[in-house]
Amino acid sequence: MSKKVAALGLDVGRKRIGVAGCDGTGLIATGITTIVRSSYDQDIAQIKQLVEERNVNLLVVGLPYTMAGEIGSQAKQVQKFARRVAEQLHLPLEYMDERLSSVEAENQLKARKRFSSYDKGLIDQQAAEIILQQWLDLRRSHLQEGGDNLHR
């Protein structure tokens, strides 16, 4: 179970990308930054810099399923972006269901009294942390059960 993981969690939105990372043990996800989107080239440059700085070996991207559990137009856009990024950076890609992660992020920030309705970037960063933490928890339980890979 001691497989090292250096994952980067992404909450991809139209205006911003929340980013989270994890410690080498794969136990704890932490919000890192929020990328304000401008162009694909600039987005990828910022993600690439984080990947290199943190020796990332995997991308975990939140997939915004509809409340009915289907892949809608927003999820398709996120998949297209995530596949391009993963391919360009030569990294494996995993998806996590991100339904309600922004609501949960906002609630967590309010509970910690770190919330301002104007700080959407902090919400995106917290949502990325939630997405990555859920993936890490799922991975850990899967490894404890004797599996090696999660479903992609």
Swiss-Prot record:
Q: Which organism is it from?
A: Synechocystis sp. (strain ATCC 27184 / PCC 6803 / Kazusa)
Q: Kind of enzyme, top EC level?
A: hydrolase
HAMAP family, A to Z: Nuclease_YqgF
Pfam families per the record?
RuvX
Q: What is this protein's function?
A: Could be a nuclease involved in processing of the 5'-end of pre-16S rRNA.
Q: What does the record list as GO biological process?
A: rRNA 5'-end processing
Q: Where in the cell is it found?
A: Cytoplasm
- Report what the protein is called: Putative pre-16S rRNA nuclease
A GO CC annotation given for this chain: cytoplasm
Alphabetical list of SMART domains matching this protein = YqgFc
EC numbers on record: 3.1.-.-
Alphabetical keyword list: Cytoplasm, Hydrolase, Nuclease, Ribosome biogenesis
Q: Which InterPro entries match?
A: RNaseH-like_sf, YqgF, YqgF/RNaseH-like_dom, YqgF/RNaseH-like_dom_sf
NCBIfam families noted in UniProt? RNAse_H_YqgF
Top-level taxon of the source organism: Bacteria
Q: Which family does it belong to?
A: Belongs to the YqgF nuclease family.
Any one GO MF annotation of this record: nuclease activity
